């Protein structure tokens, strides 16, 4: 959970920016988007293997 205390003589917009930055650091928005919809295990496995293949292609390109 992210807490941001508004400092004395600080504008609300600045505190909101700090809050957004902290949320981004902690990966809260990414987690919310990930949990938004149900993904069956078969689809998770498929995506995971596709990402692995993509990584392998990138490393092959970098080696040559």
Curated annotation (Swiss-Prot):
Ranges of compositional bias, category Basic residues: 55-64
One GO term of the biological process aspect: translation
Keyword Ribonucleoprotein: yes
Keywords: Ribonucleoprotein, Ribosomal protein
GO MF, one example: structural constituent of ribosome
InterPro entries assigned to the protein according to its UniProt record, in alphabetical order: Ribosomal_bS21 (IPR001911), Ribosomal_bS21_CS (IPR018278), Ribosomal_bS21_sf (IPR038380)
HAMAP family named among the record's database cross-references: Ribosomal_bS21
Name of the molecule in the record: Small ribosomal subunit protein bS21
Species of origin: Elusimicrobium minutum (strain Pei191)
Gene this chain is encoded by: rpsU
């Amino acid at each position: 959970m992210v807490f941001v205390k508004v400092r004395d003589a600080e504008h609300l917009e600045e505190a909101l920016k700090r809050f957004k930055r902290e949320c981004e650091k902690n990966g809260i928005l990414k987690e919310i988007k990930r949990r938004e919809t149900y993904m069956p295990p078969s689809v998770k496995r498929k995506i995971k293997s596709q990402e692995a293949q993509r990584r392998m292609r990138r490393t092959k390109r970098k080696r040559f």
